[in-house]
């Protein structure tokens, strides 16, 4: 039987070592591996990857600039998760507020990490009624 594909994100960062340290300290990420310039991390069992910017690759010339990707985190304590990130240097985004969804209230807010990546942080409610 063929295994289904798995999706993850790779975040382009200006300094991979600094980014690894920040994601571990601020978000509680654990390091899966580190090749120097490219690293694998995970939060809550969800893997993601960091890649140091390569100025010779035009697709990677704008770390910290405009992005059309947002990383989503689901936790029991969205307020605490965001506060920890902001205390470590992230920029506060939208405050955690309740949104009425088909399953009830979903609390969500966000921040921008020091490398320009947008994060939304919500409670686990989308997964409780499946």
Protein language model regions, located:
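Vicinal oxygen chelate
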Residues: 1-10, 20-112, 121-130
């Amino acid at each position: 039987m063929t295994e289904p594909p798995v999706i993850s994100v790779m975040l382009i960062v200006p300094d991979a070592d600094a980014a690894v340290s920040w994601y571990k300290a601020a978000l509680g990420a654990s390091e899966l591996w580190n090749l120097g310039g490219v690293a694998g991390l995970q939060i809550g069992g969800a893997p993601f990857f960091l890649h140091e910017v390569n100025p010779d690759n035009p697709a990677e010339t704008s770390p910290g600039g405009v992005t059309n990707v947002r990383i989503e985190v689901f936790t029991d304590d969205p307020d605490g998760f965001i506060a920890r990130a902001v205390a470590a240097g992230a920029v506060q985004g939208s405050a955690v507020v309740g949104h009425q969804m088909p399953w009830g209230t979903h609390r969500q807010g966000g921040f921008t990490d020091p490398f320009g990546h947008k994060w939304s942080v919500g409670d686990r409610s989308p997964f409780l009624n499946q």
